[in-house]
């Protein structure tokens, strides 16, 4: 009996130590985000931009895998706002996901809301951004997830981590740009500059003194955590005369591969190692547009930062290329791909492989075929100017499977689902397009240009094994669409061009080591196939991360039912959840 008691005491003591060590290792990080108007000067002009804590870009958050984030958002701006934690799985914490009218009503001016969630099984680079209107043009920042304490990277530990946020800047109020586009039905005005960490760089007016500078020592290896936080533009990124070793993307590790250039759609992140193995000098880091939509206007300019060797015999500290007169100390410029270089994009995306054997579902319960396309609606007869500003006097729209997604306004979708409120949404999103046609052909019937509008969800049972074929279409114009799924990572098991053919294209499926992503670039005039297991209950939107497109309705949402027991059931809503 005494032996049994002693053994039980010993087991209890060990369990206590283990619990204490886990509790100590997994920390809770508390932050306060104050949403406010801040004077920001770019391109010679000053604007009252919406920021977090007066910072543009916003605060960098640093956590370890397993940590909890508690972020109180206080809205002192004049717009409604929400914050989305892009790529965070939000296991059972869908109330913290952030998309406006999907998982919550917006935080009104003068109000606050506290986001609380835990990072589970993710390491690498994520980010956060506003998910209301076009406020994410200036409301965004990095979220760096390190391995748990005592663990290490599956690659050589870098000397430093450097987040690089690629963005867009409007010499105007981005909210007004969107409102004008919605009013007229036309495409929104393009941005006036691309940025790296909020700065346009040397090639734009009034910008060279504040160009982002990244210092490096000879022989030093740093990890560049590159994030495309631009609203509407996939971007190429490169560094003059340096190789980039890709080791991760969307907070998942990859088999390392070396490249001269990377490409990121809006929403995507890529981790690359770079080594100071060149003669000490100044080298431009540069980003420019990848534009796949034919005849669509875009900003054909280049943003730059500077990789500056600390032993370079040149420069004043902290400035751009204007720190010395003449050209002798100008940074070396890299060669970037042409704006329409789809071949480079394809080679890059097809180089991705998961670091280890992937747990890809091989049996499928739900098989969806989802077409992606723009559209054109007729101008309303009572429109004030009598002529909308889309092509031939129409209004732009967009859809998935011929359904243009409409957000509710009185309740969020998750609130309506959780409380059983009728009339907010339906669960009849089609698993395939209503009409089969030559999706990437040149002679698509104009009858397919006007989609239905609705708030249609697709219901999934907990634990369902899901496959989605995402098919680009030539309606209006084919285009590379970065499709982002909230609440989940998914395996990209194949991609290709033309119309997906299940009889021959299934042979291309990679079920061994496909990359795990949260945002997939569906090839222009092509398709991508993704798979995941529906193990996270809630309402999760899937949308194009080109913000012009989501404002036109290029989205849908999944309703994932609760499973069995507490661990398969979404948590109860927080007490301070905003009301509409």
Swiss-Prot record:
Enzyme class: oxidoreductase
Cofactor(s) annotated in UniProt: Cu cation
Residue stretches in coiled coil: none
Subcellular location: Secreted, Extracellular space, Apoplast
Subcellular location, principal: secreted
CDD domains for this protein: CuRO_1_LCC_plant (cd13849), CuRO_2_LCC_plant (cd13875), CuRO_3_LCC_plant (cd13897)
Glycosylated residue positions: 80, 189, 300, 340, 392, 402, 410, 443
Tissue: Ubiquitous and constitutive.
InterPro entries noted in UniProt: Cu-oxidase-like_N, Cu-oxidase_2nd, Cu-oxidase_C, Cu-oxidase_fam, Cu_oxidase_CS, Cu_oxidase_Cu_BS, Cupredoxin, CuRO_1_LCC
Cofactor: record remark: Binds 4 Cu cations per monomer.
GO terms for MF: copper ion binding; hydroquinone:oxygen oxidoreductase activity
Position of the signal peptide: 1-25
GO biological process: lignin catabolic process; response to copper ion
Gene3D superfamilies given in the database record: Cupredoxins - blue copper proteins (2.60.40.420)
Domain Plastocyanin-like, first and last residues per copy: 34-150, 160-312, 428-564
Keyword Zinc-finger tagged: no
Residue sites binding Cu cation 2 per the record: 86, 129, 545
Organism domain of life: Eukaryota
EC number: 1.10.3.2
Binding locations of Cu cation 1: 84, 484
Binding of Cu cation 4, residues: 481, 544, 549
Binding site for Cu cation 3: 131, 486, 543
Function comment: Lignin degradation and detoxification of lignin-derived products.
Similarity comment text for this entry: Belongs to the multicopper oxidase family.
Name this protein carries in UniProt: Laccase-5
Organism of this sequence: Arabidopsis thaliana
Taxonomic path: Eukaryota, Viridiplantae, Streptophyta, Embryophyta, Tracheophyta
């Amino acid at each position: 009996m005494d032996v049994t008691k002693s053994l039980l005491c010993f087991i209890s003591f060990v369990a206590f130590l283990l619990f204490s060590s886990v509790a100590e290792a997994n920390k809770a990080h508390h932050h306060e985000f104050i949403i406010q108007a801040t004077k920001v000067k770019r391109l010679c002009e000053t604007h009252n931009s919406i920021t977090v804590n007066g910072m543009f870009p916003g605060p960098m958050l640093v956590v370890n895998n397993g940590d909890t984030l508690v972020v109180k958002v206080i809205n002192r701006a004049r717009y409604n706002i929400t914050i989305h934690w892009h790529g965070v799985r939000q296991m059972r914490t869908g109330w913290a996901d952030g998309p406006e009218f999907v998982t919550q009503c917006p935080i009104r001016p003068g109000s606050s809301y506290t986001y609380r969630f835990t990072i589970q099984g993710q390491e690498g680079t994520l980010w956060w951004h506003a998910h209301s209107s076009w406020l994410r043009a200036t409301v965004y920042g990095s979220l760096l997830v390190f391995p748990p304490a005592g663990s290490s990277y599956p690659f050589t530990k870098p000397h430093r981590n450097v987040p690089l946020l690629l963005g867009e800047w409007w010499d105007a109020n981005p909210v007004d740009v969107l409102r004008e586009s919605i009013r007229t039905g036309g495409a929104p005005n393009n941005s006036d500059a691309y940025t790296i960490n909020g700065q346009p760089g040397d090639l734009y007016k009034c910008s060279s003194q504040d160009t982002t500078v990244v210092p490096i020592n000879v022989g030093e290896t740093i990890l560049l955590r590159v994030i495309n936080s631009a609203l509407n533009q996939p971007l190429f990124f490169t560094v003059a005369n340096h190789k980039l070793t890709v080791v991760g993307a969307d907070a998942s590790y990859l088999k390392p591969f070396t490249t001269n250039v990377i490409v990121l759609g809006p929403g995507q992140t890529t981790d690359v190692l770079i080594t100071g193995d060149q003669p000490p000098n100044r080298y431009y880091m540069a980003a420019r547009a990848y534009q796949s939509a034919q005849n669509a206007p875009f900003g054909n300019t280049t943003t730059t930062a500077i990789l500056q060797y600390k032993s370079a015999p040149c420069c004043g500290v902290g400035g751009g290329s204007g720190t010395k007169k003449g050209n002798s100390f100008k940074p070396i410029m890299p060669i970037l791909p042409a704006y329409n270089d789809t071949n480079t994009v394809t080679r890059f995306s097809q180089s991705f492989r998961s670091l280890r054997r992937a747990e890809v579902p091989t049996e499928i319960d739900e098989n969806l075929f989802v077409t992606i396309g723009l559209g054109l609606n007729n101008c309303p007869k009572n429109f004030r100017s009598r002529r909308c500003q889309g092509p031939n006097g129409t209004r732009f729209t967009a859809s998935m499977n011929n359904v243009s997604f409409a957000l509710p306004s009185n309740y969020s979708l998750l609130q309506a689902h959780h409380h059983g409120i009728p009339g907010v949404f339906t669960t009849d999103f089609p698993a395939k397009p209503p009409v089969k046609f030559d999706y990437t052909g040149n002679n698509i019937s104009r009858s397919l240009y006007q989609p239905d509008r609705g708030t249609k969800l697709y219901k999934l049972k907990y634990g369902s094994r899901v496959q989605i074929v995402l098919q680009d279409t030539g309606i209006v114009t084919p285009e590379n669409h970065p499709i982002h799924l909230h609440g989940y990572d998914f395996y990209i098991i194949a991609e290709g061009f033309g119309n997906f053919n299940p009889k021959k294209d299934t042979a291309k499926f990679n079920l061994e080591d496909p990359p795990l992503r949260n945002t997939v670039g569906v090839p222009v005039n092509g398709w991508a196939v993704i798979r995941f297991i529906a193990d996270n209950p809630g309402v999760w939107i899937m949308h194009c991360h080109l913000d012009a497109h989501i404002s036109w309705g290029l989205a849908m949402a999944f309703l994932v039912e609760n499973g069995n027991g507490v661990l398969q059931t979404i948590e109860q809503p927080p007490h301070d959840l905003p009301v509409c």
